[in-house]
Regions:
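Single conserved hydrophobic/aromatic residue that forms the stacking wall/gate
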Residues: 1-7, 11
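Charged, low-complexity, helix-prone segments enriched in Lys/Glu/Asp/Gln
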Residues: 7, 149-153, 190-191, 198
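A structural signal for small-residue-enriched, beta-sheet-centric alpha/beta enzyme cores
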Residues: 12-152, 157-160, 165-169, 175-179
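Short, amphipathic C-terminal "tail helix"
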Residues: 171-202
């Protein structure tokens, strides 16, 4: 029974990865050398309100961030924008490229470590470590007065691991947000994407 469940999961995962590959290939065939990627439509309203960007236009990578980077690079894409909720993207800050909870889930541990690194007071460190959700941990960070300092450091780590996976084959930018606090952090060149994407949305492929 455990073997059968594992095999079914592998089949489902492979089907999802094949779907991502088809979407990427279709986009590349239209002549685009850049692609916007998101784990899903979580944050759809935030992206529309903040940037005027419709997440429905992006390729949905589900939990397979690493596989998506590999496929995009192999196809010849030069640039990628990854947008996502902290619940998914904070895992990338620990080098986790498959963000499904059955693979790894150290969201709170990573946030606690980053808070400690940024000098957050011990009483807040304990609150963060005791949090049940990333939103709860963010509330403790906000109260500590170091939320955005910690988020900027988290984004540094996310970009480090994205670049490590890409191996210089494509440039990756990232925006991370939460339901309650909106935009948490973004990479240096992420803002420049939205002029490009707005032009594309005016003439959808």
């Amino acid at each position: 029974e455990p073997y059968r469940r594992q095999r079914q999961m592998c089949i489902r995962d492979r089907a999802l990865i094949d779907t991502i590959r088809v979407e990427l290939r279709q986009r590349y065939s239209f002549g685009y050398d850049y692609v916007a990627v998101a784990p899903g439509n979580y944050g759809l309203d935030f992206m529309k309100e903040s940037y005027g960007y419709d997440l429905d236009m992006s390729v949905k990578c589900s939990n397979f961030i690493g596989e998506t980077i590999d496929m995009a690079a192999d196809m010849g894409f030069k640039r990628m924008l990854l947008t996502g909720h902290i619940g998914k993207l904070i895992k990338v800050a620990g080098g986790i490229m498959n963000t499904h909870s059955r693979e790894a889930d150290c969201r709170i541990e990573l946030l606690t470590a980053f808070a400690f690194k940024c000098g957050v007071a011990p009483e807040y460190i304990k609150c963060i470590m005791d949090s049940l959700t990333t939103e709860e941990a963010l509330a403790a960070l906000k109260e500590s007065g170091r939320l955005y300092e910690v988020m900027d450091y988290a984004m540094e780590r996310i970009c480090f691991y994205l670049d490590k996976r890409a191996k210089g084959r494509l440039e990756i930018d990232c925006i991370m947000y939460s339901n309650e606090f909106g935009e948490l952090a973004k990479s240096r060149k992420a803002e420049k994407w939205f002029t490009l994407l707005a032009q594309e949305q005016a003439q959808p492929i």
